[in-house]
Curated annotation (Swiss-Prot):
SMART domains: PP2Ac. It comes from the Eukaryota. Fe cation binds at residues 128, 130, 156. Pfam families: Metallophos (PF00149). GO terms for molecular function: calmodulin binding; calmodulin-dependent protein phosphatase activity; metal ion binding. Residues 534-548 have a biased composition (Basic and acidic residues). This is Serine/threonine-protein phosphatase 2B catalytic subunit. The lineage of its organism: Eukaryota, Fungi, Dikarya, Ascomycota, Pezizomycotina. The active site is at residue 189.
Amino acid sequence: MESNNGTGAPGAFHTQQVDNAIRAIQHKRPLPEIDFTIHTMEDGSQVSTMERVCKDVQAPAMFKPSDEQFFEDETHTKPDIQFLKQHFYREGRLTEEQALWIIREGTKLLRAEPNLLEMDAPITVCGDVHGQYYDLMKLFEVGGDPAETRYLFLGDYVDRGYFSIECVLYLWALKIHYPKTLWLLRGNHECRHLTDYFTFKLECKHKYSEAIYEACMESFCCLPLAAVMNKQFLCIHGGLSPELHTLDDIRNIDRFREPPTQGLMCDILWADPLEDFGQEKTTDFFVHNHVRGCSYFFSYSAACHFLEKNNLLSIIRAHEAQDAGYRMYRKTRTTGFPSVMTIFSAPNYLDVYNNKAAVLKYENNVMNIRQFNCTPHPYWLPNFMDVFTWSLPFVGEKITDMLIAILSTCSEEELREDSATTSPGSASPALPSAANQDPDSIEFKRRAIKNKILAIGRLSRVFQVLREESERVTELKTVSGGRLPAGTLMLGAEGIKNAISSFEDARKVDLQNERLPPSHDEVVKMQDEERAQALERATREADNDKKLQTLSRRLSTS
């Protein structure tokens, strides 16, 4: 027996430890009283747990309205606009029947309208909304009450923002109320292809059902394509086309269908002015639009030629985010008026662009631009994920890390023994023998322990892959890796703002999402391949992890 170097009997030492532990339990200090109605934030400020921390965002409405609440009067011919406005503001939902009623009644009105609308001033023209319902309410504050103000919307009511169905239902309800003073055009996002790729289809299924989505798809095919305002301005979502010579070309389109990927209907929804519009080095009227992956860029010369031929003053369009909410392009030689104007009505687009939004008010031959900023809104995790689904990979990764850390705990003596067994020149491990296959043999049990440790390591790496997927922001993908810097999503809007500091940064980051997206089958295939590669990489890293190999070897031989 080894001596304990004069430190006394080991038994007495352990007895003293036990006595101390018992004494600590018997004379336990009383726990301090905690007021659970008060929570201290990271910055030291205190908030009440009995109230909402974000008072700018109202508590959600937990009920679905009765027909008495939904309809304006007993005739049941018009929805109650004021009720819907407040109900949607509180994230309230309608019954399936009520939502379908709004969409179908709106569809009847849209179907009866021509491809090319004609309206007189005064009117307020609005650009992209993109599911930003709370900013849409601000738009009506700035632009005027729809009961007293004439409105023309240029499309893109859905996708990217997480309140698209509320935007559709509210705008369609306004159309039912004011069919002759509120007009809705089609944007490139009002189609099956983009709504399936981005968020609108998922949103409809999450908040309502696929039947609501299908009703919206039918309704989108009924939206008019263009408008001539005050016999002076062509209003469209995208831009010009090599196939657009006169306004009759628009009137002759068969619009009741999914937009094609080329041709006049495609170009009206997808085309853009050249980036160096007005200072082009090319003499071509149209250049392939490599940014969108379809349609064209049109030149200053193309715009001037079209305006002169059709006796128009300017083209008013949407389709492109603008830092100031609008952009005036080079003036025409004949009228001195901007040949093209872009209006964008979604402020702080995607919660990261930091842009202003704008509407264009035209009255008494005077054109005014009204700008406005974003409004606080409820937060949704990407793809309408619930917090448990989103956070499980984080929890799983930490638990496996903790398990490995616990198993890695060892004394210096054990480490010395392990390094001795793995010293250079040591013999290679023996090949499995018949005895090693016996479940009762020591070798078999050791190998089983080793495999379990390695499996935990692989599991840890897999959770890491899943955690990285949870951090992926599906709407914003950086050019260099498909995701924002790790952790920015957990930091919420502030973290993303730090990662993307300017409008131009955000625009560059988001550029690939402005393209015509791949088909659903291609997306599924790419996602499956990415996941398989990530999991294969995770397994390979775990198998080559020296710390794990050392740990498994030490535990299996102890």
